[in-house]
């Protein structure tokens, strides 16, 4: 397969420059006959989750296609679902560069991107042009300059704008790179946010005559008590699903490696066990009442199967996709 050669060339570049170059090429071919260059035939393995039928259980995690620029090209690679975003109400540049780092020996990434995106209106225009026949999730967040106490307003603005175009909506309250964002995972702040989101979802269902499920994305760094509280809140508010997990602040498995001390969220193989354990514990709390989308360090069929064995209904990849490329999609979907 050609990807090892592509990866070797891309890894000569700064990680963010490599990402920009790749997306530049994907933008050129998306929606054109040249999409055939990245198209892969994968088996159909339908899975029902959150009331939706996914053509296979593998999705692309949020963060790679923040603005929905390459939906068709990425979809052609065989994903059953794509989660685009995180998108915010207004465009924002994100944190200062450099802000994305490879831990090559660990097959991990550290990012402190900070929700850089072109805004929700731009994303919606891109979604309108796409022809992806899988499930499209749209991951939403708050602007950096929106005070945390007003954060729910940003989520409601985004919900209103994406509702008509989303297969499901993901609520990102677990990125470590937006100051104060993770506090929305706890106690009254979480209850307040989920109440507002559920009310908005009900209102939008009436307006659009369709029900779009909402999933909440959580951090892997929650302690046992916090995880129990989150599970309880999600169930009480009738949230449709939970995405476990986002990136971690834990560096215990990458000590001494190049870039390990960079601030930001760590993803990839070093996150694999931690996220699987969160899924296992969450599954025990939820008792099958709420589906789990498992993400974190999936870089093989075995890693994907471990997430499902722990309690996930669907799985997503990101860092594994960077390190292994499109062949990983076919491998996982074929053998999962």
Swiss-Prot record:
One GO location term (cellular component): cytoplasm
**Keyword Amino-acid biosynthesis annotated:** no
- Please give the superkingdom of this protein's source: Bacteria
Please give the Gene Ontology molecular function terms for this protein: dihydroorotate dehydrogenase (quinone) activity
Topology in membrane: Peripheral membrane protein
Give the enzyme's EC designation.
1.3.5.2
The active site lies at 175 (nucleophile)
Q: What is its main location?
A: membrane
One Pfam family, short name = DHO_dh
Stored SUPFAM superfamilies: FMN-linked oxidoreductases
Signal peptide boundaries: none
Enzyme class comes to oxidoreductase
Q: Which CDD domains match?
A: DHOD_2_like
| Cofactor(s) recorded in Swiss-Prot or TrEMBL | FMN
Question: How cofactor binds (record note)?
Answer: Binds 1 FMN per subunit.
Enumerate the catalysed reactions: (S)-dihydroorotate + a quinone = orotate + a quinol
Amino acids binding substrate: 66, 111-115, 172, 177, 246-247
Q: How is the subunit organization of this protein annotated in UniProt?
A: Monomer.
What PANTHER family does the entry give? DIHYDROOROTATE DEHYDROGENASE (QUINONE), MITOCHONDRIAL, DIHYDROOROTATE DEHYDROGENASE (QUINONE), MITOCHONDRIAL-RELATED
Job of this protein? Catalyzes the conversion of dihydroorotate to orotate with quinone as electron acceptor.
Protein's UniProt name: Dihydroorotate dehydrogenase (quinone)
Provenance organism = Salmonella typhi
Gene name of the record: pyrD
């Amino acid at each position: 397969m050609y990807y090892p050669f592509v990866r070797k060339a891309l890894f000569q570049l700064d990680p963010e420059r490599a990402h920009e170059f790749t997306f530049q090429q994907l933008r050129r071919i998306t929606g054109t006959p040249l999409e055939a260059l990245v198209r892969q035939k994968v088996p159909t393995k339908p899975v029902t989750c959150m009331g939706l039928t996914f053509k296979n259980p593998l999705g692309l995690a949020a963060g790679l296609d923040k603005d929905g620029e390459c939906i068709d090209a990425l979809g052609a690679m065989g994903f059953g679902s794509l989660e685009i975003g995180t998108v915010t109400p207004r465009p924002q540049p994100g944190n200062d560069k450099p802000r994305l780092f490879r831990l090559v020996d660990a097959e991990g990434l550290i990012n402190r991107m900070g929700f850089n995106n072109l805004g929700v209106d731009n994303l919606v225009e891109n979604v309108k042009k796409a022809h992806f026949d899988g499930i499209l999730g749209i991951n939403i967040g708050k602007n950096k300059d929106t005070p945390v106490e007003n954060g729910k307003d940003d989520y409601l603005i985004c919900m209103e704008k994406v509702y008509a175009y989303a297969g499901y909506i993901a609520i990102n309250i677990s990125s470590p790179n937006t100051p104060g964002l993770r506090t929305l995972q706890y106690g009254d702040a979480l209850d307040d946010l989920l109440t507002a989101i559920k009310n908005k979802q009900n209102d939008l269902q009436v307006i659009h005559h369709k029900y779009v499920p909402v999933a909440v994305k959580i951090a892997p760094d929650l302690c046992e008590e916090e995880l129990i509280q989150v599970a309880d809140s999600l169930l009480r508010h009738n949230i449709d699903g939970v995405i476990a997990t986002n990136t971690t602040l834990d560096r215990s498995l990458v000590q001494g490696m190049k870039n390990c001390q960079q601030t930001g969220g760590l993803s990839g193989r070093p996150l694999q066990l931690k996220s699987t354990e969160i899924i296992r514990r969450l599954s025990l709390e939820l008792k099958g009442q709420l589906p789990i989308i498992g993400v974190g360090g999936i870089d093989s069929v075995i890693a994907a199967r471990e997430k499902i064995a722990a309690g996930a209904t669907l799985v997503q990849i990101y860092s594994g996709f960077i390190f292994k490329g499109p062949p990983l999609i076919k491998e996982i979907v074929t053998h999962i």
